[in-house]
Amino acid sequence: MAKLNAYFGEYGGQYVPQILVPALDQLEQAFIDAQEDPDFRAEFMSLLQEYAGRPTALTLTRNLTKGTKTKLYLKREDLLHGGAHKTNEVLGQGLVGKRMGKSAIIAETGAGQHGVGSALASALVGLKCRIIMGAKNLERQSPNVFRMKLMAESIPSSVTLKVAVNEALRDWSATETTHYYLGTAAGPHPYPTIVREFQRIIGEETKLQILAREGRLPDAVLACIGGGSNAIGMFADFIDEANVRLIGIEPAGKGIDTHQHGAPLKHGKTGIFFGMKAPLMQDSYGQVEESYSVSAGLDFPSVGPQHAHLNAIGRANYESITDDEALEAFQSIARNEGIIAALESSHALAYAIKMARIDPDKEQLLVVNLSGRGDKDIFTVHQLLEERGAL
């Protein structure tokens, strides 16, 4: 039986209860078989184009970098059906689940975008859908919660996203007819590889589009990092392009020194979490610390193993942006470009703007993966601005 590589350097693996191993092995083989099946590939690409709306646009910003010599492009995953890049992976996972003969899916979600994607993909391919969401995020992501309720069977709440992912894994192990949609490029093998392969369309399109527009590759591609699915989707096709910098942006929250952040890559320690070996936010006793970010989708205490490996070998750089910086970028792109970006994407955007302003005379070509739209965040942003007297 063919096997995928379970590790990225020292990171990754399959640290799960024995009861889950057969399901993961079955999934791995089903994914390999699907990838080798031209009919599966054709159906997946057809759904991406005719249902999801790919290819997404590559938009040159007109005003954000005025006064500098930076050309900043946005890869518009916010224009994808469902409102974010999550649609790419759930369509693929849904087709695999259907191929495996599953009748239902279970998924966890933070900001709700993976939940929305899971619900729409399940409705499309005819699978029952149960979504588990942290109680805190149910409150701050009410628009996405209602969208999920329109399409999904049930949305029970947990206390935190950390608990939600563990509940989803536990429920998955209880029945052979259920397929688990994992929401990011993390977790036990083979999920990091599966999610990357269904998301790599982002980077593949970006490469073709930027070559057509500029006649060369960008100097850097940037993406926000929670678990890392949108970033690895952007990075995957550029990893072998040595002259293209890969820059991931973690949430610094209220400041790295406050411990209220979600930056395990640069400020965590290697541990075992969510079925994988990866950098992890831990206290002095080795217990998992709660992550924090104004952005629900980046509020995750660990990170995908391929990002950990890219960081370890120096192929990618990982920086951090605070809540305040992300909020400023959120407002800036709205006022200057007429785009309401997700708070997640605003972290990457904030770092790109910072790069342009640090050296305004430097000629550089940057691409930010605008991973989702900000409709879901408008109530959060309104509350924050109101508290600061900025409205």
Swiss-Prot record:
Q: What class of enzyme is it?
A: lyase
Quote the catalytic activity from the record.
(1S,2R)-1-C-(indol-3-yl)glycerol 3-phosphate + L-serine = D-glyceraldehyde 3-phosphate + L-tryptophan + H2O
Give the source's domain of life in one word. Bacteria
Which positions bear N6-(pyridoxal phosphate)lysine? K86
Question: One Pfam family of this protein, by short name?
Answer: PALP
Question: Which pathway is it part of?
Answer: Amino-acid biosynthesis; L-tryptophan biosynthesis; L-tryptophan from chorismate: step 5/5
Recorded GO CC terms: cytoplasm
Q: Recite the UniProt keywords alphabetically.
A: Amino-acid biosynthesis, Aromatic amino acid biosynthesis, Lyase, Pyridoxal phosphate, Tryptophan biosynthesis
Question: Hydrolase among the record's keywords?
Answer: no
Entry function: The beta subunit is responsible for the synthesis of L-tryptophan from indole and L-serine.
Q: Which HAMAP family match?
A: Trp_synth_beta (MF_00133)
Q: Record's family?
A: Belongs to the TrpB family.
Q: Record's PANTHER family?
A: TRYPTOPHAN SYNTHASE, TRYPTOPHAN SYNTHASE-RELATED
Query: Under what name is this protein listed?
Result: Tryptophan synthase beta chain
Q: Which gene encodes it?
A: trpB
